[in-house]
């Protein structure tokens, strides 16, 4: 099916929001211009809505294989499509881990059969993510690994991390890191700060993250490797990443929507839906994350979509697993709380969710360019809705944002020229 989207707006190559039509033919973007006509295409009048590149998320947890009670590739990618994401990168903390040919081939087969959006799987750095034996990077790259990470646990052994970075550099691949110094975690379930003290909870100190990032940055410099930092959350982390970039070290970084919107002061009680890793930090940390995003220290926004069951989250804040679901709330949360409040511009938000992650990892995505795959999201910037977890397509309903009123909701998502999801009656 060919589609002609009429009367939309998009961000052009100069970074300006302008009027446009967009023609999709044979799964590709055929033309982006005003006043397009086409005889062999279904016309969809988007009536002034935003025509955006499909959103790109480099940090997601689909749970399959091994955690299908939390999420599956099918439910997770449907949720991604509903959130406007057309390319997502799946973390390897599954069971089994994609750490060898057999496991990666099985994962790729599942993706091919079940995914509703483009899914790029990470390869594990170490076998079973146990930290003691490196995987075969060459084989995992051959089988389509997006990059290498032991996300969820991090690589504690510096010698192992250096060896991994050297091997990844030879393959022109990135090493992506969840940064925690295990000896500093202190069995914490929240940030070590006012909230942990008030509720008598073990806290995770900020230095737990920043000291690990500092170590890895020096290792990356020694290995001449592209090193990407997951979910930055502290002022100290922003500082060391900024200094590393100024020194010319190949480091990039991401921040989550929840760390941009919330801090520990926003936690109403010991609610497990506010438990994520890294935890919500203090006001100064939150301000540093915004500053880092604006000055280029932090390159992109990634959801860290981490679904869990209601039963798991009901165990209380100390026993419940870390993580919140993120696909279906990311854009409206960021648009409402950052763009509408003048913290960043709409153009910047689009870049942080599309071209910045795509360019950082060399993906042919994130831009509405003629000849590229038609990965497109239509967003109604005027639509206001209340976040209702019962409507999520994700199996995970675990969100701290239930009841929040937000504007800027995706209404249609196109992947490879096919409609992957659309809001009923939104474009008729």
UniProtKB/Swiss-Prot annotation:
EC number: 3.5.2.3
Binding, Zn(2+) 1: 59, 61, 151, 304
GO molecular function, one term: allantoinase activity
Catalytic site positions: 304
Reaction equations catalysed: (S)-dihydroorotate + H2O = N-carbamoyl-L-aspartate + H(+)
Cofactor(s) the protein requires to work: Zn(2+)
Lineage: superkingdom: Bacteria
Residue sites binding Zn(2+) 2 per the record: 151, 178, 231
A Gene Ontology term for the protein's cellular component: cytoplasm
Keywords: Hydrolase, Metal-binding, Pyrimidine biosynthesis, Zinc
Pathway(s) annotated for this protein in UniProt: Pyrimidine metabolism; UMP biosynthesis via de novo pathway; (S)-dihydroorotate from bicarbonate: step 3/3
Chain sites annotated for binding substrate: 61-63, 93, 277, 308, 322-323
Cofactor comment text: Binds 2 Zn(2+) ions per subunit.
Role this protein plays: Catalyzes the reversible cyclization of carbamoyl aspartate to dihydroorotate.
Assigned protein family: Belongs to the metallo-dependent hydrolases superfamily. DHOase family. Class I DHOase subfamily.
Protein name: Dihydroorotase
Organism: Bacillus cereus (strain B4264)
